[in-house]
Amino acid sequence: MTTAFYPGSFDPITNGHVDVLVQALNVAEKVIVAIGIHPGKAPLFSFEERAELIRRSLAEALPGKTGDISVVAFDNLVVDAARTHGATLLIRGLRDGTDLDYEMQMAGMNRTMAPDIQTIFLPAGTASRPITATLVRQIAAMGGDVSAFVPAAVLQALTSKRPN
């Protein structure tokens, strides 16, 4: 069974992330969504909240297929975490050329450290190309409508985080 590792902060998961996950299930039988935990960062959502939002978003987007997806935390090198979970593929979403430049550097470094793990680039769909979790958080914090950019569960969670 081919297992893919999809690392990110997912703070919060966006429609772009969901798009990449749907594509990832076309190249791997199992996908591990890996939430990076960085002690120096203060995320909007806790690990537990992000994991639950991922599960709820995927249940909505992929009814009946969520058994092929698991959610874990990691705080070490991506390749080490992927190896720990038995993954042989790293999934990376690409929105534009800037993402490609950065991701090619990372893929090269990861390949040197872990030649047994291959990076797969999956292009974002047209509708999700402009979406970033950072922009979603900023727009939501200013009271903007982010419903076109995030799953319903995330929209509800963002709304509840916003002060009245």
From Swiss-Prot:
Annotated positions binding ATP? 9-10, 17, 93-95, 103, 128-134
Q: In which pathway does it act?
A: Cofactor biosynthesis; coenzyme A biosynthesis; CoA from (R)-pantothenate: step 4/5
Protein family according to the UniProt entry = Belongs to the bacterial CoaD family.
Record's function text:
Reversibly transfers an adenylyl group from ATP to 4'-phosphopantetheine, yielding dephospho-CoA (dPCoA) and pyrophosphate.
Residues flagged as site, Transition state stabilizer: 17
Report keywords, A-Z.
Answer: ATP-binding, Coenzyme A biosynthesis, Cytoplasm, Magnesium, Nucleotide-binding, Nucleotidyltransferase, Transferase
Q: List cystine links.
A: none
Q: How does it assemble?
A: Homohexamer.
Q: What is this protein called?
A: Phosphopantetheine adenylyltransferase
Q: Which InterPro entries match?
A: Cyt_trans-like, PPAT, Rossmann-like_a/b/a_fold
Q: Which residues bind substrate?
A: 9, 41, 78, 92
Question: Could you confirm whether the keyword Cytoplasm appears in this record?
Answer: yes
Q: Name one GO cellular component term.
A: cytoplasm
Subcellular localization is given as: Cytoplasm
Listed cofactors: Mg(2+)
Please report the organism this UniProt entry assigns to the protein: Rhizobium johnstonii (strain DSM 114642 / LMG 32736 / 3841) (Rhizobium leguminosarum bv. viciae)
Single GO biological process annotation from the record: coenzyme A biosynthetic process
Report the superkingdom from the record: Bacteria
GO molecular function per UniProt = ATP binding; pantetheine-phosphate adenylyltransferase activity
Q: In its keyword annotation, does this UniProt entry include Hydrolase?
A: no
What this protein catalyses is: (R)-4'-phosphopantetheine + ATP + H(+) = 3'-dephospho-CoA + diphosphate
What PANTHER family does UniProt report for this protein, alphabetically? PHOSPHOPANTETHEINE ADENYLYLTRANSFERASE
